[in-house]
């Protein structure tokens, strides 16, 4: 007997999956969800329980049907006897018939009308009696969220008016179409003495339900590890992969820097390893932001002659957020200025402590150019993969993740996929993110056409009807019609979702998400002007104690807010706190596009108060800062009794006389205050628009220099 899943077995018996799950639990069988496969012995035990009870119900129904047929036959015989009795009566005389012809005609009409009325009444009465006989109050019912009064009455086999009356006695005015909440539903059911249970609704459009991890699957075999290489620019990521794979990837790319995500598979000591070569860590984060978790091991490449750099720190934070083991590859040890010990010392500050120093992080010194240490690195990858016990079932229909996608001029939409479970075949009907299709051709990482690909294998496919996004999941279906239906439904849902507000956390909606149980950790990224301020702010935020949510600092750094910070905040559903710093142009655009909340402050107390108030639900709708323009200082003039006049050129928006201003130098805020004078030539001006020059003096501030940015802003009252 072939294995069946719980929902398939339930469908055969016209039962709810929940009933099967409850019965299995009563048999002391551990059940994770409705997708779990049933063993042969379990199916036999369930057959005895459910099919036997169904057989009894069928016999009972047949007995009732036979009894009903017998009654119908008796009624028919009675009618025939009555009819023959009426026919045997003698007819009246012709004279009497002629004499009362009109009267008989009228009587006949009245009689027909009376008979028709009686027949109509009989038709109505007969089904009513039958329903009253079969209607019984069930001992238990199941319901879906949002059940109405009418639907509940139908399930309980009672009149809607009875339920409406009970609701009225509870102080609830309702009609037949009123939806009931769980608390009210429990009160009504308890009043009727009926047990209720919420139905588990399975959404086939949710591709995540097909990514089940069945550890008891006897067909599961060991699969290759998926490794991501990350690190600072020019520290040798692609050169390292090139040395491992014995190809010259770097030479064929512009400037020697990786331009796209490459996925490659190599074999070492009889075991395969799949490498994802990401451009820095942006793609890695983008995939994780869409819910994809494809990486098993992260290799952090650090140059021995350069040490820990800003992108190295960001890569460490990304790896920690993804919760995958990290192996540190200390590259360029063959250079005269190499100092591996310094690298290890610097990385201990970020929680990566070498095994030799009592930690649990593997450090491998190597040279990507000469090939020294490559074998040691591959050996360490094999050991870490062995400890993780990575397994997959090649006999299932394939599921996995999109690594990259493009629109090819000759082939149409093409996508690089990583198979995570099952086997992908040419001709399979597939749903990829919000698109679908049938696989027309499949190419491996060597550029060769293949017909099938097993777990942890990267392939490029064609045949889908649109370009998916990196990080989208894919699922193979046995029926092309089903794949089309699900793909179209997902596309429509994505269009609707794009029109709605983003659900990224912000201080404005933080308390609402806490109430709904959606928030347990508030992820925070802190950027400041000096390291001391950043550390002080991080320590202060960690001390905030509000029940139901914790503050988690996921990244801190000195300098202006950049696009990478916004990407990390979006992937981690976090917010960005800027202390005495401003976002650059790219960060502003990215934050607006991804709806990431950025809060800019100059006083630590204000930051703490704002976040604590948001966590307690006390954040009042007051004012929002709106930047109205920027001017660049081109020349300065010092005038006695006046101060420093900044000869400026308005580069963005406009500068108004009543606006607040801040002076920014190299992305760091130096001063915030009010405008003193705004002049156009010798005349006072109310405002100066973009593209015009003006003279600016600032109250109580004269330390203006050429190249400074004067940013004008207004405080606008908003409704939250």
Curated annotation (Swiss-Prot):
Residues 48-138 are annotated as: Disordered. The gene is infB. GO terms for molecular function: GTP binding; GTPase activity; translation initiation factor activity. This is Translation initiation factor IF-2. It comes from the Bacteria. GTP binds at residues 231-238, 277-281, 331-334. Residues 60-75, 99-113 have a biased composition (Low complexity). Keywords: Cytoplasm, GTP-binding, Initiation factor, Nucleotide-binding, Protein biosynthesis. It comes from Staphylococcus epidermidis (strain ATCC 35984 / DSM 28319 / BCRC 17069 / CCUG 31568 / BM 3577 / RP62A).
